[in-house]
Regions:
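Short runs within selected transmembrane alpha-helices of multi-pass transporters and secretion channels
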Residues: 70, 139-157, 165-173, 194-207, ...
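Hydrophobic transmembrane alpha-helices of multi-pass small-molecule transporters
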Residues: 61-64, 176-180, 206-210, 288, ...
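Transmembrane helical elements of multi-pass membrane transporters/channels
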Residues: 17-36, 138, 149, 172, ...
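Small-residue-rich hydrophobic transmembrane alpha-helices
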Residues: 49-109, 146-165, 258, 278-342, ...
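Residue-level signal for short hydrophobic patches within transmembrane helices
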Residues: 12-31, 35, 58-65, 141, ...
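Helix-terminus/linker motif at the lipid-water interface of multi-pass membrane proteins
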Residues: 31-50, 119-126, 182-189, 251-282, ...
């Protein structure tokens, strides 16, 4: 069997080859929502923006499912390949693909059945609800395709073809971007046009990703590879739970934030709809930075997973530290943009009155103040997932959202009103950063001193 370059190639070259396409693919995923937001803001107004924000939890839940199965199966595959177990790798990939399809269909049915109830729970106001329902009812159709595409992208990267994974996402995003102005302005379909443009783009990405099923090189499928195995499926989910749980926590915090902003916003001069619209714009802007960090972590994972399985711990440490340095460069640029050019960024998403821009600028500067350290927690969680320590990875993934941000979002507004919702972000970011440094530092010291560590 040919030696895998993950075990001997220069780490900087590997991270570049794997992370850059992953970053592009991850950015493309976030662009689906960003592009819709910009065109809807220009064509419908800030109520349209608020509507897409209310519907956004559907996308984060979808991503959570894709990460659960995609990251889980890809991490399992990388470990199996590192241990030179090709049949086990094929079984992991096959069961992962089957799970993607099952979860996608279930998600569509549940979402459409309880759509109105869910939108109200997500914080839709009376004025926003009609737009949100129209948008979400259409975009849910594309969710099964999105789950399979995002999930298979992780397997394609694990197969050593990150550029193809990137192409799958880029094609869909280009189609979405072309169709958005046509459907919204030329066809005059409004917010429904943006939704259909998104779905069509997702279908094209799905077709390209699914075609790769017959092109895998390090994974050799047999019919038995796709036989549903409950034990194998649970293993996959356990290895993807850290990345997925972070997204689930993101969904929960979105719902809490939207409801808190409308409640406390009603007590201020901003009202209910302005905070809701501003929050979504800030979160989706930050999603671009997080997408880059996710791309770095996805590029880092197969490198760390393979070398941990091969017991080359010095390469594990080198890959993690290089990923942290990349993150620092990105977050520094983001900090400068968010603190010094917030109004220019917000203006991209459409016009609004003076109160709208006043609150949106305040939100961006305050909530994203600790963006410099935000990515460390995500990279650290992915680090533990890659070395097979799923429980520790899951716990670390939950720290910012569940252990810090959710309680702070509920408690701080009691003292500081709507400003408390904004302050919860930087406090949670810094707290999660400190915990991440402690846990990863301890693990790296263990690896440095160990001669025979096996995945737990």
């Amino acid at each position: 069997m040919t030696e895998n370059p993950l075990g001997y190639e220069k780490i900087s070259k590997l991270l570049k080859n794997f992370a850059v396409p992953s970053i592009v693919a991850s950015l493309i995923g976030s662009i689906y929502n960003i592009v819709d937001q910009i065109f809807i803001g220009q064509g419908v107004g800030y109520l349209g923006n608020a509507a897409t924000n209310v519907a956004y939890p559907f996308s984060t839940i979808c991503l959570a499912i894709a990460l659960l199965v995609g990251i889980g199966s890809a991490s399992h595959v990388s470990l199996c390949l590192g241990c030179k177990e090709p049949k086990a790798a094929a079984k992991a990939a096959g069961n992962g693909i089957v799970l993607m399809g099952i979860f996608g269909i279930i998600y569509l049915l549940v979402g459409e059945t309880f759509l109105s109830l869910l939108l109200k729970a997500f914080g839709a106001t009376t004025d926003v609800f009609p737009y949100a329902k129209q948008y979400a009812s259409i975009t849910l159709i594309g969710m099964p395709f999105l789950i399979v595409t995002n999930g298979m992208s992780n397997l394609i990267r694990a197969d050593g073809k990150p550029k193809y994974s990137m192409v799958c996402m880029v094609v869909g995003a280009i189609i979405n971007t072309i169709l958005d102005p046509i459907f919204i302005f030329v066809c005059d379909w409004g917010i429904a046009g943006a939704a259909w443009a998104t779905v069509i783009g997702q279908i094209f990405s799905f077709i390209l990703a699914f075609r790769y099923l017959w092109r895998f090189q390090t994974i050799h499928f047999e019919k038995e590879s796709f036989l549903f195995d409950i034990k194998e499926s649970l293993k996959i989910c356990s290895m993807g739970i850290s990345s997925s749980s972070n997204q689930i926590a993101v969904t929960v915090i979105q719902i809490i934030q939207y409801n808190s902003l409308t409640y406390y916003g009603a007590l201020t001069k901003y009202g209910t709809d302005i905070p809701l619209a501003a929050c979504g714009i800030v979160m989706k802007t930050n999603a671009i930075i997080l997408a880059i960090v996710v791309g770095i972590s996805q590029g880092m994972q197969p490198i760390i997973g393979f070398n941990y399985g091969a017991r080359q711990y010095h390469r594990v440490r080198e890959a993690y530290m290089l990923a942290i340095k990349w993150n620092l460069v990105v977050s520094t640029i983001a900090f400068i943009a968010f603190q010094f050019f917030p109004q220019s960024i917000i203006s991209l998403f459409g016009d609004g009155d003076e109160l709208y821009f006043e609150f949106a600028v305040l939100f961006m500067r305050t909530y994203l103040f600790m963006v410099l350290v935000n990515g460390v927690q995500l990279l650290s969680s992915s680090f533990f997932t890659a070395i097979g320590k799923a429980l520790k990875g899951a716990l670390l993934a939950l720290t910012r959202q569940t252990f810090f941000l959710i309680p702070l979002t509920l408690l701080l507004p009691l003292r500081f009103g709507i400003m408390g919702v904004l302050l919860a972000g930087p406090v949670a970011d810094f707290s999660a950063f400190v915990l991440s440094i402690v846990l990863v530092g301890t693990e790296l010291r263990k690896q440095k001193n160990a001669t025979n560590i096996s995945p737990q």
